Amino acid sequence: MTETLRVAVIGAGRMGADHIQRLHQRIHGAEVAAVVDVDLARAQAAIEGIPGAVALADAEEALNNGDVNAVLIATPGFLHEDILLKAIAKDIPILCEKPLTPDAESSLKIVEAEVALGRKRIQVGFMRRFDAEYAALGSIIRNQELGELLMLHHQHRNPTTPAGFTNEMLINDSVVHEFDAIRFFTGEEITSVQVRLGKVTKNAPAGQHDPQHVLIETESGVLADVEIYVNAKFGYEVATQASFEDGIVSIGGDKGPYTRSAGRWGGNVTPGFEERFGAAYDVEIQSWVDAALRGEIGGPSAWDGYATAACCEAGVEAQKNGEKVAVKLAAKPDLYS
């Protein structure tokens, strides 16, 4: 049995660079063997101080490197399909940042390739499942501590968006996390999505309709809604309230320390996702490494990546027509049952 994962990190941008340092500094049982980026200078900068790691400009070269026995994909989503298919052919553990691929059709191809391999090798990077509060709420739901889950209310607020952040990206890059969270909490597939477009903030860039209200339904009839507001200015806030037969649970709300000074009271708002979910990323990657060393995955599967891609497609269609749009899914293979 492999005792150490020797990981090729493909993509050395914001997310990839963060994972490189995470693997090098905080994760046990893994080491960075290679870093790949089309900007070779960026890859070289990323491996500085990491003994034995090599910088490469080509993903296939990394996968063919005999010192590599696992891969972490942190490139833009449109590059994922080709890298995933090549990594599946190598039969090595794969951690793929979301999205699995940018659309349901190509995501299904990845699922089919993994089914043909005969075992699960892909873990998809939906880090919220590893957040302590998300895990606690998930446990309350599964154990029916407050009876049946009836409704979920989500708020997803970002301080601002980068240039070129389109309406579709509100669904594909932001609400995608809520789609996965709803599937995680309920243990069910999402059956329909509707998007309502109301009053627009003055802070939205030209061509972007912000905020939006997303209405979601699951197989058993659990209703969920998402306020997606990506130019909220005040900071980064992701919160959920779950309504049960016998109570309500809220997560992701305000946290201390709270101060009282000069006639005022208050606390701090997290500025971004790294601060809010940094610990969850650590738990996620450690779970992947531990599971990979056992020949398993330790989190969301390729099927989860495909299912959320299908939800996103329904969401983008619903943005455009304002109607309730059914989520179209292929039959679930036994591998993921």
From Swiss-Prot:
Species of the source: Pseudarthrobacter chlorophenolicus (strain ATCC 700700 / DSM 12829 / CIP 107037 / JCM 12360 / KCTC 9906 / NCIMB 13794 / A6) (Arthrobacter chlorophenolicus)
Job of this protein: Involved in the oxidation of myo-inositol (MI) to 2-keto-myo-inositol (2KMI or 2-inosose).
Catalytic function, reaction form: myo-inositol + NAD(+) = scyllo-inosose + NADH + H(+)
Domain of life, source organism: Bacteria
One annotated GO biological process: inositol catabolic process
A GO term for molecular function: nucleotide binding
Keywords in alphabetical order: NAD, Oxidoreductase
Top EC class, one word: oxidoreductase
Any Pfam family hit: GFO_IDH_MocA
EC number(s) on file: 1.1.1.18
PANTHER family, per database record: INOSITOL 2-DEHYDROGENASE (PTHR43593:SF1), PTHR43593
Keyword match ATP-binding: no
Transmembrane parts of this sequence: none
Subunit comment: Homotetramer.
Record InterPro entries: Gfo-Idh-MocA_inositol_DH, Gfo/Idh/MocA-like_OxRdtase_C, Gfo/Idh/MocA-like_OxRdtase_N, MI/DCI_dehydrogenase, NAD(P)-bd_dom_sf
Descriptive protein name: Inositol 2-dehydrogenase
Family: Belongs to the Gfo/Idh/MocA family.
